[in-house]
Amino acid sequence: FSGLGSQNPGLLVLAK
């Protein structure tokens, strides 16, 4: 999810 998080920080939170 590194690429997605780069564009959308919110996705990183959901990924965790």
UniProtKB/Swiss-Prot annotation:
GO cellular-component terms in the record? apoplast
Family statement: Belongs to the germin family.
Q: Does the keyword Manganese apply?
A: yes
Main localization (coarse) = secreted
Q: What is this protein called?
A: Germin-like protein 3
| Protein function | May play a role in plant defense. Probably has no oxalate oxidase activity even if the active site is conserved.
* MF GO annotations: metal ion binding
**Where does it reside?**
Secreted, Extracellular space, Apoplast
> Which organism encodes this protein?
Betula pendula (European white birch)
Q: Any idea which UniProt keywords this protein has?
A: Apoplast, Manganese, Metal-binding, Secreted
Its subunit composition reads: Oligomer (believed to be a pentamer but probably hexamer).
The highest taxon in the source lineage is Eukaryota
Task: Tell whether Repressor is among the UniProt keywords.
Answer: no
